[in-house]
């Protein structure tokens, strides 16, 4: 496999990659070139693993390849020019790469300790599916193809992101392998990536909510793309206990299981968006928030509610083909009015000038893009110290 990697464009939903067998000086910046050995528009991360058989004809060999890439929007329309042509001299390891490459690296950057991991990797163009394996210890067979004896979870998926349905408290490893259309391995396992989310680390602050807090946006980016998580921009350490898909009731129901073991001093709570857009009455969401507050206080945890940013029903319909309750704005206003009367942070304040979330801040109408997450984090960084005077910052 040939491995290509480039700096991400955080406004892109996809990328177009062209590969040439010689250096070219006649390629237009704003249009595809002629004579490419390979071209694809179906790249959703800033990297690609492409089989040599998809690039070269039988018997062809090249000591050097040349490539370029440009960002695309959701409709696969360019939003920028092609990059400058770059040379690629395939190293032995690149040519022989037979497994996907992990992209999710936990516990390194700010906001990268999450209870519900998302296993993200660079896919292989010739693969039909992938098996992700999670183990309790480092796998004993890094060069093998069999499951590890330490396996605790695995799942076969067709895309390059697996949302773990279970909370992972403690230390684990994850890895992935590619399979063909018959379910046969195309190669071995990827390197095993360790990750740790442990109450023994004594987190002072926890983040609790749905996918808006879990992270991700612009359809192609998930929670392991840290630039799309507001926790990445916080000035203080925080463990992310959020789970994508949560309604306010679901957040209530998992409080004892997911929050209590960590026993943070403060829990930042943002939940209810999925409930309100589905037509759940504001009064029910408020009741759920009150129940979360009480559960926290009963455990000696200080609950801090956060207001809900607006959504964009047209964007949600376009991205997910889902309807939005017609009275969502009034419901959001009622819930946010309650939140503002409580110990809270007005995370929705940066968006008060808009009745709906602008497309350039949330392309899918629901999940804020990196700019929106940065704006939310700025408010949290400004407001939390008054509610948490003993806050430990970086």
Which functions belong to the PLM regions below?
Residues 74-93, 181-197:
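Extracellular fibronectin type III
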Residues 174, 251, 343, 360-394:
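Histidine-centered active-site loop/cap adjacent to the catalytic His
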Residues 313-349:
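Substrate-gating cap/lid alpha-helix
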Residues 2-11, 115-126:
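Conserved aromatic anchor
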Residues 220-221, 231, 249-288, 309-313:
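Oxyanion-hole/transition-state-stabilizing segment in secreted/luminal serine hydrolases
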Residues 184-244, 254-263:
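Serine-esterase "nucleophile elbow" of acetyl-processing enzymes
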Residues 18-62, 134-167:
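Recognizes extended acidic, P/S/T-rich segments that occur
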């Amino acid at each position: 496999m040939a491995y290509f990697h480039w700096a991400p464009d955080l406004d892109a939903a996809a990328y177009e990659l062209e590969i040439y067998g010689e250096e070219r000086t006649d390629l237009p910046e704003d249009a595809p070139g002629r004579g490419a050995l390979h071209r694809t528009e179906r790249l959703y991360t800033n990297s690609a693993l492409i089989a040599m058989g998809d690039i070269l004809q039988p018997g062809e060999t090249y000591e050097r390849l040349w490539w370029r890439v440009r960002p695309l929007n959701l409709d696969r329309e360019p939003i920028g020019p092609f990059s400058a042509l770059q040379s690629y001299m395939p190293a032995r390891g690149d040519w022989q790469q037979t497994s996907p490459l992990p992209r999710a690296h936990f516990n390194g950057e700010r906001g990268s300790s999450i209870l519900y991991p998302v296993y993200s990797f660079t896919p292989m163009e010739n693969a039909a599916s992938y098996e992700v394996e999670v183990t309790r210890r480092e796998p004993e067979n890094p060069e093998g193809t069999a499951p590890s004896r330490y396996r605790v979870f695995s799942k076969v998926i067709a895309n390059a992101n697996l949302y773990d349905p279970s909370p992972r408290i403690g230390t684990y490893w994850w890895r992935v392998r590619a399979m063909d259309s018959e379910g046969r391995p195309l190669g071995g396992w990827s390197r095993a990536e360790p990750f740790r989310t442990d109450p023994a680390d004594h987190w002072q602050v926890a983040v609790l909510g749905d996918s808006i807090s879990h992270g991700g946006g612009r359809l192609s980016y998930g929670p392991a793309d840290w630039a799309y998580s507001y926790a990445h921009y916080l000035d203080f350490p925080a463990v992310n206990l959020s789970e994508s898909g949560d309604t306010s009731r679901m957040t209530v129901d998992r409080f004892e299981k997911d929050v209590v073991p960590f026993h943070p001093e403060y829990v930042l709570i943002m939940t209810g968006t999925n409930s309100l857009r589905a037509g759940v009455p504001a009064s029910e969401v408020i009741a759920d928030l009150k129940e979360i507050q009480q559960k926290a206080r009963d455990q000696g945890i200080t609950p801090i509610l956060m207001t809900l940013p607006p959504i964009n029903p047209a964007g949600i319909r376009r991205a997910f083909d889902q309807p939005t309750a017609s009275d969502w704005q009034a419901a959001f206003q009622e819930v946010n009015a309650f939140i503002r009367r409580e110990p809270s942070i007005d995370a929705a304040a940066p968006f008060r000038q808009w009745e709906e979330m602008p497309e350039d801040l949330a392309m899918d109408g629901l999940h804020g893009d990196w700019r929106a997450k940065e704006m939310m984090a700025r408010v949290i960084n400004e407001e939390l110290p008054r509610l948490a005077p003993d806050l430990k910052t970086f």
